[in-house]
UniProtKB/Swiss-Prot annotation:
GO BP annotations, alphabetical order: queuosine biosynthetic process; tRNA wobble guanine modification
Record note on quaternary structure: Monomer.
Reaction catalysed by this enzyme: 7-aminomethyl-7-carbaguanosine(34) in tRNA + S-adenosyl-L-methionine = epoxyqueuosine(34) in tRNA + adenine + L-methionine + 2 H(+)
Main location: cytoplasm
NCBIfam families assigned: PRK00147.1 (NF001140), queA (TIGR00113)
Protein keywords: Cytoplasm, Queuosine biosynthesis, S-adenosyl-L-methionine, Transferase
InterPro entries: QueA (IPR003699), QueA_dom1 (IPR042118), QueA_dom2 (IPR042119), QueA_sf (IPR036100)
A GO molecular-function descriptor: S-adenosylmethionine:tRNA ribosyltransferase-isomerase activity
UniProt protein name: S-adenosylmethionine:tRNA ribosyltransferase-isomerase
Function: Transfers and isomerizes the ribose moiety from AdoMet to the 7-aminomethyl group of 7-deazaguanine (preQ1-tRNA) to give epoxyqueuosine (oQ-tRNA). Seems to have a role in modulation of ADS (arginine deiminase system) gene expression, perhaps exerting a negative effect on the translation of arc regulatory proteins.
Organism (species): Streptococcus gordonii (strain Challis / ATCC 35105 / BCRC 15272 / CH1 / DL1 / V288)
Amino acid sequence: MNTADFDFHLPEELIAQTPLEKRDASRLLVVDRSSGEFSDQHFDSIIDQLQPGDALVMNNTRVLPARLYGEKPGTGGHVELLLLKNTEGDQWEVLAKPAKRLKVGAQVSFGDGRLTATVVDELEHGGRIVRFDYQGIFLEVLESLGEMPLPPYIHEKLADRERYQTVYAKENGSAAAPTAGLHFTKELLAQIEAKGVKLVYLTLHVGLGTFRPVSVDNLDDHEMHSEFYTLSEEAAATLREVKANGHRVIAVGTTSIRTLETIGNKFKGDIQADSGWTNIFIKPGYQWQIVDAFSTNFHLPKSTLVMLVSAFAGRDLTLKAYEHAIAERYRFFSFGDAMFIK
C-alpha cells in the first residue's frame, strides 16, 4: 500500500487550537465495524459503550516540559533544545535548533545559569546528546524552566499546562501527550469503574516521531521510531483474567494499542508483564492480538496513526468516518474530538 492511500483534505479551521473548557464535553464519533454505521455523540456517553467485566486500558505517562530556551555563554546566541529521551544519568538525547552551532564541547546556559547543557555527541537530523549540570533535582529545575512541547500544528499558547496532561498522568517521560486520554475526567472514570469496568494503566513514553509524517511512498519502506513501554505484573494479570472471562480489552489511544499489541506479538497472544522498546508499525493486513475496541482522536492525513486505525476498521470505513467527521465539523488532532471503534 502507498502513503497516498491514506490522504484526505482537512480544512485548517478544524484543527483544534485550544482544549474545550470541560474535558468530557468533546464529541465522540462511534464507529461500528460490523454494520459500518456511525453515531454522533458526546464523549461522556463512552460509558454506554463499555460493559461490566471489560478492561479500559490507559497510558499514564506524563509529559515533560521538555522545550528549553537558552543561550550560548560568550556569544549570547539563542538556542532551543527539545528533550527526547534520557539516555543515561544526566545525559539526554535532544533536538537542537540551530544545530549547526552546537559542536561537541559547546555549552548552552538556561535560566541565568541554573541549568547548563554540554554537547557530548552529534547525531543526524539536528540531534545531539547533551549532559546537564544543575543544582537540586533535575525534574524540578525542568518544571521551572521548561515549556510544554506542543505539537507543531498548535499555534496558540497553552493557558494551563495541566490541560496537556491526562488526569491520571503519573510517570514522567513523554515529549507529547497520549491525547486520547485528555477527554477523561476523574468523575467519568469513577462512573466507569462503578459500572464494573476494570481500569488498567500501562506506560508508554511518547516520542516526537508520533508527529513525523511518513516521507516514503511505499509503507514497507517506512521506519517507525522507538518508544519505551512498561506493563506491570498486576496489569497483565487483570488483562489475562478479563480475556479468560470472555470480556473485552478496550484501549484508550494508539500508544496503549501499540504497547498491548507489542506484548501480544512477543508472547504469541498471551499477556505478560514486560518492558522495553517498541517500534511496532500497525498497518492494514496486521493480525490483531489483544485489542478488541478502542478510542482515539482524529489524526493527520498520511500519518501512521490513520494507518493504525485503518488496520482495525479497514481503510474504506476509516476514510468514510473521517469524511463524516469533516462534514459534521468535528475538531481534529490533539485538542480535538474522539472516535470509538468497536
